[in-house]
Amino acid sequence: MPEPAKSAPKKGSTRTAAKGGKKRRKSRK
């Protein structure tokens, strides 16, 4: 569930994720 859910928002939320820190969290991994 978390994999597909992140894949969808990650593509369109890439900019928002970087601002919120979602992409940063993935990079930290």
Curated annotation (Swiss-Prot):
Question: Is Cytoplasm included in the keywords of this UniProt record?
Answer: no
The record's Gene Ontology cellular component field reads: nucleosome; nucleus
- The Phosphoserine modification is found at 13
- Which GO-annotated molecular functions does the record name? DNA binding
Which UniProt keywords are present, listed alphabetically?
A: Acetylation, Chromosome, DNA-binding, Nucleosome core, Nucleus, Phosphoprotein, Ubl conjugation
> Segment Disordered: which positions?
1-29
Protein's cellular compartments: Nucleus; Chromosome
User: How is the quaternary structure described?
Assistant: The nucleosome is a histone octamer containing two molecules each of H2A, H2B, H3 and H4 assembled in one H3-H4 heterotetramer and two H2A-H2B heterodimers. The octamer wraps approximately 147 bp of DNA.
Describe the task this protein carries out.
Core component of nucleosome. Nucleosomes wrap and compact DNA into chromatin, limiting DNA accessibility to the cellular machineries which require DNA as a template. Histones thereby play a central role in transcription regulation, DNA repair, DNA replication and chromosomal stability. DNA accessibility is regulated via a complex set of post-translational modifications of histones, also called histone code, and nucleosome remodeling.
UniProt family annotation: Belongs to the histone H2B family.
Know the name of this protein?
Histone H2B
Organism this protein belongs to: Cyprinus carpio (Common carp)
